[in-house]
């Protein structure tokens, strides 16, 4: 966010609406090299418990909001909403969020134990914020990165189902309409679900090809494999970039210029 503030402090466009050149300059300013991207990821580990993570996400479109952005009816309002600081009271979190906070690590440990039983040579770490190498407006914070001697490198995304906490996790995925059964009785994620958008975004940002969704309830865990869908992502990325250029940039510009004028 510091780069964004600096850009607008030195940006003296007199046009009511900035043209493509202004926005291109903004994008060039935001670009990170590989060392920057690695430093951001390392420096934001701990996610919501790390203030650096909150700061680094400001001004980005992050994977958990991709479906919301792509299907918003009023995109000006959507841009404002994305830039509005969270009003969540950490001492009075909604029950579903608190359930996720309470059990995410348990689900992670259950998955690691299960995976290592079959694939002993593997490592797991929880990344911070990943920034896209190819599109500086996009970021993601997956729940894990696994490096396995058999499976290669892949992401993990953990979902703890509060409303279905007493269901078997496979049934929780079906009842919540995250997944559907296919002919061989396995589950596939439904492409219209927000988790599908989120995971495809995480894969695109990370550059990896596979993610394992880990569903947790108090009956255990169930996993669903997902692979990168290039056609889906190419269209989504095009629309996300258009949203950023048309709506997010203007909203950022208004916020930063208001701050500058207030400080004068």
Residue ranges and their predicted role:
Residues 115-140, 148-250, 256:
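Nucleic-acid nuclease catalytic cores
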């Amino acid at each position: 966010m510091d780069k964004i503030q600096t850009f607008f402090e030195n940006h003296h466009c007199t046009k009511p609406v900035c043209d493509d050149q202004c926005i291109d300059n903004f994008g060039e300013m935001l670009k990170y090299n590989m060392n920057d991207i690695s430093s951001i990821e390392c420096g934001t580990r701990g996610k919501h418990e790390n203030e650096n993570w909150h700061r680094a996400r400001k001004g980005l479109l992050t994977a958990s909001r991709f479906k919301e952005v792509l299907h918003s009816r009023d995109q000006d309002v959507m841009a404002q909403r994305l830039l509005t600081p969270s009003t969540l009271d950490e001492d009075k979190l909604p029950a579903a969020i608190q359930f996720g906070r309470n059990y995410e690590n348990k689900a992670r440990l259950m998955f690691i134990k299960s995976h290592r039983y079959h694939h002993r040579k593997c490592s797991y770490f929880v990344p911070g914020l990943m920034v896209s190498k190819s599109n500086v407006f996009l970021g993601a914070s997956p729940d894990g990165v696994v490096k396995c001697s058999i499976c290669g490198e892949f992401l993990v995304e953990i979902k703890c189902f509060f409303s279905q906490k007493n269901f078997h996790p496979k049934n929780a995925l079906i009842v919540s309409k995250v997944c559907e059964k296919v002919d061989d009785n396995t589950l596939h994620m439904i492409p219209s679900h927000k988790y599908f958008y989120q995971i495809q975004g995480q894969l695109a940002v990370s550059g990896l090809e596979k993610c394992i969704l880990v569903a947790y309830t108090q009956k255990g865990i169930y996993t669903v494999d997902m692979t990168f869908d290039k056609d889906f992502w190419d269209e989504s990325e095009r629309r996300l970039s258009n949203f950023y250029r048309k709506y997010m940039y203007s909203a950022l510009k208004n916020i930063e210029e208001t701050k500058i004028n207030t400080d004068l």
